Amino acid sequence: TTINVKCTSPKQCLPPCKEIYGRHAGAKCINGKCHCSKI
């Protein structure tokens, strides 16, 4: 899932991703935007 959060590293994406998927969230930073996935 792509979310509208700007990023330079995956660490910045983990908190918003955890809000969506809980503690089983995976976070990536692709093209300056956060991508969340459920692990």
From Swiss-Prot:
SS bond partners: 7-29, 13-34, 17-36
Recorded superkingdom: Eukaryota
UniProt modified residues of type Isoleucine amide: 39
Places the protein is found: Secreted
Molecular function terms, GO-annotated: ion channel inhibitor activity; potassium channel regulator activity; toxin activity
Domain notes: Has the structural arrangement of an alpha-helix connected to antiparallel beta-sheets by disulfide bonds (CS-alpha/beta).
Name under which the protein is recorded: Potassium channel toxin alpha-KTx 2.18
